[in-house]
Amino acid sequence: IIEVLIVLAIAGLIMVVVFLAVPALNRNSRNNALSTNANNIMSGVGTYVSNNNGTLPANVAAAAVSGGKVTIGATTGVNQEVVKVDSSVTNFSIVDAKSITTTSGIGAVQVVKKAQCNDTKTDVVTTGVSSRSYALLYVAEGSGGDILKCIDG
């Protein structure tokens, strides 16, 4: 009987470890997809800026991502950049002042013009930066709740 209890205890311990590890692996997979999409969007913004003599794209207010693509420069009709994204990106905006927060929902992506990432890469700063600077903020999934992540342009 004691041997059976020991085997059951070990099996239970293994099951607990597996049940704790699987959600973390799924979260990491979703965050990796978001990070890849965010970097692709930043590349698209960089290409747009290069093709338009350093001009940052016009503001886009919380556009829903449709057809698996984000259009940068959508209001100009000229020199647009289309970036393919997957379903992890839920909405996209280009703004002058940050409005995205952790309550915006996982997958929200925002390019903030005239800004750069703070030292911890969790928010943007707008003082003392070039008028051609831009940063991208996106909401990712953390172990204790949603978190903001930042990528400098």
Which residues does each predicted region cover?
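Alpha-helix exit/C-cap motif
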Residues: 43-63
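Localized chelating/binding microdomains
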Residues: 7, 35-38, 42
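N-terminal single-pass transmembrane signal-anchor helix
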Residues: 1-22
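Acidic, glycine-rich loop-and-strand cores that form catalytic or ligand-binding grooves
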Residues: 59-116
